[in-house]
Amino acid sequence: MARKTLRARRFFSLIFPFFFITSVYAEQTPESAKTVTVEAKNETFAPQHPDQYQSWKATSEQSAREDALAEDPRLVILWAGYPFSRDYNKPRGHAYAVTDVRETLRTGAPKTAEDGPLPMACWSCKSPDVARLIQQEGEDGYFHGKWARGGPEIVNDLGCADCHNTASDDFAQGKPALTLSRPYAERAMEAIGKPFDKAGRFDQQSMVCGQCHVEYYFDGKNKAVKFPWDEGMKVENMEQYYDTIAFSDWTNSLSKTPMLKAQHPEYETWSAGIHGRNNVTCIDCHMPKVQNAEGKLYTDHKIGNPFDNFAQTCANCHTQDKASLQKVVAERKQAIHDLKIKVEDQLVHAHFEAKAAWDAGATDAEMKPILNDIRHAQWRWDLAIASHGIHMHAPEEGLRMLGSAMDKAADARTKLARLLATKGITHEIPLPDISTKEKAQKAIGLNMQQINAEKQDFLKTVVPQWEDQARKNGLLSQ
């Protein structure tokens, strides 16, 4: 019965055009459409399509900041030596995409366009201005340089032109005109046998989200974004790919392990779960069709929790009531959280024990297999926990990855115990007090007072200059 209901609703959705956002552009020939500059100002599309625009704008209501490091100080140790040890908040609404990347301590406090710790690539999932710059400068031109170079250019929050070809005839006629606005995402989909232009509508819906909600790394001297899917999308496939090219995001400052940092692999984990395998898309659950005050259907662009629109999302397929499904999801979330903490405890000990081994005179040859185990354990843990919705998208895969991470961490600690014994160290390696974020940051040598002061100065002096320049150049509304 549930499957028939889903088919009926999907057939219904085919009858009515996808009311995403239609174009303000006049009708164009295919040739002229190719040369139209990407329009990054989202409010441009508001007059003709107020429902979609207002629902997108309502992502600003998702304003709460949740400090993941304060909630779980172990993370500071696992990311010692990496900017994530300074600052890591859980995600919030798309309307804060640009604000949050400016304000995070991870992007530093650059004074000039050539200053700062991070590359231009760190803008790549934040704004339709990225698509505009890639169109204007080419990929190599866009990726060239430091993150601060993009400050006066990337000023509009993630929105219309990130997902829709707003200059196309289809879009002007009210069709969704979905597009992959990032060429590197298009290449990645082709690498896994999913060329976008040959994909069906439902596949395209999730592929558009998969431009950003994926694992990626910065490749080559230009630090260009690349998805590590050449060997496949499972955690072991990506691990093998990274190992083969000898890639690491950073070296943990305690254990000296060459580490991998997972990003937000929702597309990969969704693909591995029951929803992905049955082609229930991101849109089905997070952007359902809803009615406006006049009873007209439109796609809700306030991307959020499916339970907030239960009748339009979960109830399309499931016969259980909302409370029953919430109970199931909560149990899965708790199971993943419990195993996550156990793995983190093992990894924290492993990093400090590895430091003790180095301090005791361990050699590179002695440490290599141990560091490899730590690298693989933390990578598998990170890919599981960096996908914030894994308890819903693929709980079985999440538990499998965490179980594998636990095994690898145990292997590392067993080898460390044996190695330390050869150095005359048989007692347990004590841990410093890492019971709070502040204490953990102090334990790895971070001067947070200075880091925060520099950031505040940057926000007060540099960011206003960026915005003034953007307005003068017509990139921001006055």
UniProtKB/Swiss-Prot annotation:
Ca(2+) binds at E215, Y216, K261, Q263. Keywords: Calcium, Electron transport, Heme, Iron, Metal-binding, Oxidoreductase, Periplasm, Signal, Transport. It is found in: Periplasm. This is Cytochrome c-552. Substrate binds at Y216, H264. Its cofactor is Ca(2+); heme c. It comes from Salmonella agona (strain SL483). The gene is nrfA. It comes from the Bacteria. Its EC number is 1.7.2.2.
